[in-house]
């Protein structure tokens, strides 16, 4: 995939969910946004509005998963409806869905200091990184103009890594988190926080 002509993108992770708060792995299952998650989505919507970004200037896309759809609706402030795209769903964690990192360590012996991606790579029945990479690359290749993308933690990092023309060995160099907006244009990444908008 060539990223030389990729349009400007703003990538947003869904707001905090009940399972995020409890430390449970969601993967391709859902849990509702917490009050904090709703607040994060509304703040990100205000940040975009302050930057002059709306459904009139950018195409909005979202994962079809409930936590992302709810975040997208709050971010968009009822301007329009985001286009749902299954390629933006979160990576599956297979049989680890719904359990905590401590439970995973107890079952597998993974080191407490293991990087979070090591857990995804070891998830029994989970989606391989190659599958996530392929669907993210396919999604990006289809963009025709500036876009706002509401997705998930690991999917967000893969999208941004590919958009910057980096190899996946650098995916862990990008920040994650909720309540921030990631901007990629001309292969350059910037994290926009509520204090910076």
Name the predicted role of every residue range.
Residues 75-135, 173, 193-195:
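Phosphate-handling substructures
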Residues 4-80, 107, 124-127:
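Active-site-proximal alpha-helix that buttresses catalytic centers in soluble enzyme cores
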Residues 163-192:
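Domain-level recognition of soluble alpha/beta enzyme cores
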